[in-house]
Amino acid sequence: MRVLKQTINIFTDSFLVLYFLQLSNNNILPVGIFNLFKYTMIIITMFTIRNLLKKSKRIFLLRIVVFLNFVFFFLLFIFKEKIINYAWLLGFIGGLEEGLYFSVFNIYESKIPKDNFAKYSGMYTALNSLIAVLIPIIFGSVMSFSGFDKCLIIIFIFVFIKIIISFIYKDVNIPKEDKVNLKKYISILKSDKNVLLSHFVSFSNGLTYSGAFSSLVTVYIIKVFKTGFSLGVLTSVFALVTSFASFIFAHLIKRKQYIFLIKTSNFLTIIALIYMILDCNIYSIIFFNFIQSFAKTYASLINEGNTMIVSNYDIIKKEYKEEYFLNHELFIYFGRLISYAVFCLLAFANNTLYVNVIMVVFIIFIIYRSIVSILLQRKND
């Protein structure tokens, strides 16, 4: 289920963006509207269903997720070119689906027995690395040579597999628990600065690499390379770069080097972004994506490690792990919401100065991420 979700996300994060740009004559506003509605709905969904997650019948919610996934792509198939006028509706349905998915499926993962989790994690990582390289080329080739509709047929196959899997899952080993207590958890955030800082790191993640940066990168790639095939090839190449960066991190990087790594990778990202803004060409696009692939990978791995360290603080692990991870997700999505609000402003930028001012805001987001990541790393060293 998780691998299929990741496969579909590759399509929506890159090739749906390309489709919107093609339909709107390279107007990025529909992309921004889609994501604003999507992340607003994710936040609302995760907040409103938080207590349903602690009841035993979560499998029903998981099946709703798969149904919404089908509705999302069915609308794309039915409306075709007119879907550009309903970007908000797609965002609404996509946000509802994703908010339910990450809320429910994270709990399923947390209930995997410890003896089996390493095997599960290893299999997922291997499959995820494989699809990150192969799937973009497949979608890019199909979209360029056969059209967007043929891509949707492939997606429908994945969705039907998800439907079958959802009826295999059962509510096993998921006992009823107490309701989520956000009021008490907020008091923990006020009293423990490290816990609060870990949430700010998640917020900064939403502002940058897991936010509008992904769409921004896609827009610039399309601006230069034009076709879905080129987008697919580049996405696959930089997936390989990401895998290489992960290998280096796992085998060569020591914990004492983390702060230097955060500073260096974020500094180089800013330099590469400025270069791409001032001179958008093949070389600046490749340079930025190369640097960003390393920076994003290192930031994610370092911050994920620190997030897990904080989750095992006595004040959290005894009673508030559910609240801790739920709020981390919410902070990420709040960051993404702000990030895409800034992204939407680019659609109204009618001169170079306006564009540059908005891009400076993204640079400030990167600097903020660097600062909070370093502070949390120092606390956990």
Where are these regions (language model features)?
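Central cavity-lining transmembrane alpha-helices of secondary-active solute carriers
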Residues: I33-N51, S236-I248
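Transmembrane alpha-helix termini and helix-breaking/packing motifs in multi-pass membrane transporters
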Residues: V17-L23, R50-N51, V133-L152, K223, ...
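Helix-to-loop junctions at the C-terminal end of transmembrane segments
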Residues: T45-R58, M143, A245-Q257
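Cytoplasmic helix-loop-helix junction between adjacent transmembrane helices
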Residues: G94-L127
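Helix-loop boundary and gating motifs at the non-cytosolic
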Residues: M1-T40, N194-S236
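Hydrophobic core of transmembrane alpha-helices in multi-pass small-molecule transporters
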Residues: I84-Y101, Y283-S300
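Juxtamembrane intracellular "pre-TM" segments in multi-pass secondary transporters
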Residues: D171-N205
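C-terminal ends and interior cores of transmembrane alpha-helices
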Residues: F67-K82, F267-N281
